[in-house]
Amino acid sequence: MREGGGNMQNWLFTKARHAGLAALTAIVALMVLVPAGAQAATPPGCAALQAKYPDLKGKTLVNAINPHTPGYEAIDPKDPSKYVGFDIDLGEAIGDCLGFKLTYKAVTFAALLTTLASGQADIVISDIYATKERAKAADFITYSKVFDGVLVAKGNPKGIHGIDLTLCGAAAAENTGFVEVPLVQDMGPKCKEAGKPEPTLQLYDNNANCIQAILAGRADTYINDVNTVDQAVKAYPDKLEKAIAVTIPYSVGIAVPKNKPEFRDAVLAALIEVQKAGIHMELLKKWELDVNNFKEPDILTAD
């Protein structure tokens, strides 16, 4: 994270800095923090699920997250020992339904699934797109449609309007491991065929650094979840804008270990109860996320 970044970085980290270097070092080193905020009443169908999956009741599980996506998962600006966001609340609601608590392990986005596979985390609820490629490393319970936004500097000086030929010659900032990376790379041959320069990629570990790349003039665009892009525009209305929203053929999913199908089924069943109770929709509204992202859950595996 670069210094002097402005509103969004200040929103995420000012409180942590004020806590002192030792406290900040502890946050970075331990990376296991507690959630913030209480959940709505547990749905009535959850009692039967706790009876069906008794091994989960009373447990404390670890959720691996990349806490740099305001609205989804971020450090609480009022208390750097806590996390806040839609994914945090959704995970807590699922945990309440099944009788377990969650703690959090913060990692880079690229390390989310490896952290899960190594046993350092039990679950990943961190705005991660479920793809067949990623399903080789984990099973997914999908719960959200995907719409990406194209973030650009105010006035869109490069005239970028999507993952198309307007991207030719542009510098795109992206998160390492994000599905948008190969989409940008795939434009290279198409641009060459059209007699245009290929787009270039700058890879970063989190959303805030990608946004900073545009603010600093190093990058021309950042393509990511439309709600993340909208949050960036809200933070920097005089410096950034959303050029367009594009449909991406993926869903957001909860990742669980491939060798724990019973746990996967339990999470799926709990998510269904949470949705039936209206909690999922309430959380979308609470965090000012697009309710059109809502989808009924499904399972995605590599098979």
Show the residue positions of the predicted features.
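Extracytoplasmic small-molecule ligand-binding "clamshell" domains
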Residues: 41-127, 286
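Ligand-binding clefts/hinges and TM-proximal coupling segments of bilobed small-molecule sensing domains
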Residues: 41-44, 48-51, 179-196, 242, ...
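Extended ligand-binding regions for polar small-molecule ligands
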Residues: 43, 88-97, 156, 169-171, ...
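Bilobed "Venus flytrap"/periplasmic-binding protein-like clamshell domains
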Residues: 67-70, 81-96, 128, 149-206, ...
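Short helix-initiation/N-cap motifs at beta->coil->alpha
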Residues: 86, 104-114, 158-159, 198-212, ...
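Acidic, polar ligand-binding/catalytic clefts
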Residues: 101-165
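A ligand-binding cleft/hinge motif common to bilobed small-molecule-binding domains
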Residues: 110-114, 128-136, 185-186, 215-248
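Periplasmic-binding protein-like
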Residues: 145-152, 230, 234-272, 290-303
